[in-house]
């Protein structure tokens, strides 16, 4: 629970259509947020939202925005909606699940101006099976979601081979040199571990720890690079 004048923390979980945002949020609600004062703001712009019964059982309040994409046509209304949520519920956390065809950069532009909110994390979920084709066919939205994110969480990595995974990482790194990239299958991770990574921790993630070690020399390479300081490296995910 919040203390005194502590601000409401806000977590944005973006991702293209069908990437797995809803599945991830369900996992976080079940394992991390259950029993806490949380508001989920979701935009059902052509997508199936989280089941209301599931949220009720978890004690989560849902504030749905169904009149259009929150990061495009409803920027003004969305800001007002967030202010109303803070005023009415005074939650510990607000989780925003935007439309899959929205730009994360636009959402951040709205959120940073809302009084009483502290931006806690802004992450993008990417389907490991579809990363390459979405990068080719939906560049404006897909690339913005990746380039803006502080953490990129790959879904369905257990369903792709190592070659495909490395291609995905290369695409992400081309667009975003600094984001943390989670490649571990979600079933092998706790919700708390994912939250920690979204907030900046690398503990317990071999892929993040390896990349951090690789880059500490200042060479600028990442775990998709073959050579670091003249040495060939193999990385496991």
Region spans (language model):
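Nucleotide-state-sensitive switch-loop elements of NTP-binding domains
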Residues: 5-14, 19-135
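Active-site glycine-rich loop that binds ribose-phosphate moieties when present
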Residues: 137-142, 155, 166-168
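Flexible active-site lid/hinge loop adjacent to a nucleotide/diphosphate
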Residues: 132, 136-148
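Conserved beta-strand/loop subsegment of P-loop NTPase cores
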Residues: 39, 95, 118-126, 146-157, ...
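A short alpha->loop->secondary-structure connector
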Residues: 112-120, 142, 169-178
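C-terminal accessory "lid"/substrate-recognition subdomains
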Residues: 3, 160-237
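Short, hinge-like loop/turn segments at secondary-structure boundaries
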Residues: 56-59, 112-114, 140-142, 198-202
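Alpha-helical scaffold elements adjacent to nucleotide-binding pockets in ATP/GTP-utilizing enzyme cores
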Residues: 81-84, 106-110, 145-148, 167-174, ...
């Amino acid at each position: 629970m919040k203390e005194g004048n502590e601000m409401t923390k806000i977590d944005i979980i973006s991702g293209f259509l069908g990437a797995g945002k809803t599945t991830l949020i369900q996992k976080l609600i079940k394992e991390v947020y259950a029993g806490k004062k949380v508001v989920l703001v979701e935009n059902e712009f052509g997508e199936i939202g989280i089941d209301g019964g599931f949220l009720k059982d978890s004690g989560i309040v849902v504030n749905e925005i169904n009149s259009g994409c929150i990061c495009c046509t409803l920027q003004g209304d969305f800001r007002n909606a967030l202010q109303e949520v803070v005023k009415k519920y005074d939650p510990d956390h607000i989780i925003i699940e935007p439309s899959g065809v929205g730009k994360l950069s636009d959402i951040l532009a709205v959120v940073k101006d809302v009084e009483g909110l502290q931006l806690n994390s802004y992450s993008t979920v990417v389907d490991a099976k579809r990363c390459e084709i979405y990068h080719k066919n939906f560049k404006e939205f897909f690339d913005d979601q990746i380039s803006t994110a502080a953490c990129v969480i790959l879904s369905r990595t257990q369903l792709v081979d190592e070659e495909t995974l490395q291609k995905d990482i290369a695409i992400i790194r081309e667009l975003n040199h600094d984001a943390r990239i989670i490649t571990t299958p979600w079933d092998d991770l706790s919700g708390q571990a994912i939250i920690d990574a979204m907030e900046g921790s690398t503990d317990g993630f071999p892929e993040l720890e390896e990349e951090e070690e690789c880059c500490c020399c200042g060479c600028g390479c990442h775990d998709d690079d073959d050579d670091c300081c003249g040495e060939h490296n193999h990385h496991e995910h």
